[in-house]
UniProtKB/Swiss-Prot annotation:
Entry function: Catalyzes a trans-dehydration via an enolate intermediate.
Organism: Clostridium botulinum (strain Kyoto / Type A2)
Protein name stated in the entry: 3-dehydroquinate dehydratase
UniProt pathway: Metabolic intermediate biosynthesis; chorismate biosynthesis; chorismate from D-erythrose 4-phosphate and phosphoenolpyruvate: step 3/7
Subunit-level organization: Homododecamer.
Taxon lineage: Bacteria, Bacillati, Bacillota, Clostridia, Eubacteriales
Family: Belongs to the type-II 3-dehydroquinase family.
The keyword Nucleus is assigned to this record: no
């Protein structure tokens, strides 16, 4: 069985209320339910973690190597400046795919750079919650090929 951890960064717990013109009306809980439903027939366990605190996200990334085959991460605002999260991602030996709900390249100038992307297999941006599903599909296909 594959185990995948989905990490969500700061303010994503406010989805559904925060900037619905950018992020829509869907809540983080709804996103998590849609992900689980999409993969219900897979031999797959998906855990979800959200924190507004950089240190807790770093700890979760570092601990993940013991329990998970891969990480899907939406570092949110931390993606633009957190060298600490980048270093944590680089320190583990499991694949990481970065996801952003909105298209960061159509947003403010400071959002167009993701430092954490340097430690990711790839970045999926602008497809809403479906970006998480795309990331997990990629990971599953990648893990199957490696076996």
């Amino acid at each position: 069985m594959n185990n995948i951890l989905v990490i969500n960064g700061p303010n994503l717990n406010l989805l559904g209320k925060r900037e619905p013109d950018i992020y829509g009306n869907i809540t983080l809980e709804n996103i998590n339910q849609k992900i689980k439903l999409h993969f219900k027939n897979e031999d797959l366990k998906i855990d979800f973690f959200q924190s507004n605190e950089e240190g807790k996200i770093i700890d979760k990334i570092i601990e993940s190597e013991k329990k998970y085959n891969a990480i899907v991460i939406n570092p949110a605002a931390y993606s633009h400046y957190s060298i600490a999260i980048l270093d944590a991602m680089r320190s583990i030996n499991i694949p990481v795919v970065e996801v952003h709900l909105s298209n960061i390249y159509k947003r403010e100038e400071y959002r167009k750079k993701s430092v954490t992307a340097e430690a990711s297999l790839g970045v999926i941006s602008g497809f809403g919650y479906y970006g998480y599903i795309m990331a997990i599909e990629f990971i599953l296909n990648n893990l199957v090929r490696e076996k």
